A protein has these predicted regions:
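Secreted/periplasmic carbohydrate-active enzymes, especially glycoside hydrolases
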Residues: 1-112, 116-125, 148-151, 163-164, ...
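Active-site groove signature of glycoside hydrolases
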Residues: 148-178, 206-208
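Active-site beta-loop-alpha junctions enriched in small/polar residues
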Residues: 72, 108-110, 130-132, 168-170, ...
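Short low-complexity, flexible loop/linker segments enriched in glycine and/or proline
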Residues: 117-121, 140-145, 215-217
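Active-site cleft segment of glycoside hydrolase catalytic domains centered on the general acid/base Glu
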Residues: 135-142, 168-195
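Short hydrophobic/aromatic-enriched beta-strand-loop microsegments
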Residues: 122-130, 219-225
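Acidic-and-aromatic substrate-binding clefts and catalytic sites of carbohydrate-active enzymes
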Residues: 103-111, 135-137, 142-143, 208-210, ...
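Extracellular glycoside hydrolase catalytic/binding regions
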Residues: 182-244
Length: 244
């Protein structure tokens, strides 16, 4: 009968994974009977730790490291979402070449090929579910969100590049309600039950009040501002951050 087995592995003098030195190890799970192999599963993993604090910012393996990044959609001209492995790795290489060390994957689960590229090339990744813009009340909709979050975490928790689980994006575009706030608290709880080792985060739309009930739900928060794009000037970013 099917069963679960937990094994603790000791890796002496491990070569740590980081964005600058993305060292990977291959874990092999092999199904055997009477010394005969029936199946193999190969998984690349990295050994690393990270912290995020208000005063110290982001540190990986104890080294303070500023995060500079971009957001990425899984999309190309004439291909749409159907990207090849080469496309995924080319995207990652281009992002690396501009000097970024962080990628936010908007706003849905991306291909395993791109997560693998982030593992091997070296990025801190924010992965999120497609819970965006407008909240749909009711048990069925929330059950779907929980299922999406569960799949995202369970399918990707071995990727050392993933540091942050995003629970929603600009959800207050459609307004706020008590149910919306409660559903976010439940998603936060679910994330911590499935993976207590990683940070959770949320992306607020620009007009979200800085003192409302949507704050302090996740470990980290961000604001999507479009100064110099939809309105204002690029120079407005600094004063807003100072005020925030």
């Amino acid at each position: 009968p099917a069963d679960n087995t937990a094994v603790t592995l000791y890796v002496p003098d491990a070569e740590l994974w980081s964005m600058d030195e993305p060292n990977l190890y291959t874990v092999i799970a092999r199904l055997q009977r009477c010394n005969e192999s029936y199946d193999d599963l190969y998984v690349n993993v990295g050994v690393r730790s990270y912290t995020v604090t208000p005063d110290g910012g982001f540190s990986i393996n104890g080294v303070p490291t500023p995060l500079r990044g971009v957001s990425r959609h899984q999309d190309r001209l004439y291909k749409g979402n159907a990207l090849s492995i080469d496309d995924h790795y080319e995207d990652a290489q281009i992002i690396k070449e501009v000097g970024a060390n962080t990628i936010r994957l908007a706003h849905y689960q991306h291909s395993q090929d791109f997560y693998n590229a982030c593992d091997s090339i070296g990025f801190a990744v924010w992965a999120e579910i497609p819970f965006i813009s407008v909240f749909k009340p009711g048990e069925d909709a929330h059950a779907h969100c929980r299922r999406e979050m569960t799949e995202l975490i369970i399918q990707n928790y071995n990727h050392p590049s993933i540091m942050f689980w995003g629970i929603s994006n600009e959800i207050l575009i459609g307004g706020i309600s008590q149910e919306l706030v409660e559903r976010h608290h439940d998603l936060q709880k679910l994330c911590k039950e499935l993976d207590p080792t990683r940070s959770t985060t949320i992306a607020h739309v620009s007009h979200t009040p800085t003192d409302g009930p949507m704050h302090h739900i996740t470990d980290l928060e961000s604001y999507n501002h479009y100064f110099g794009w939809y309105g204002g000037k690029i120079e407005d970013n600094g004063p807003w951050l100072d005020k925030f």
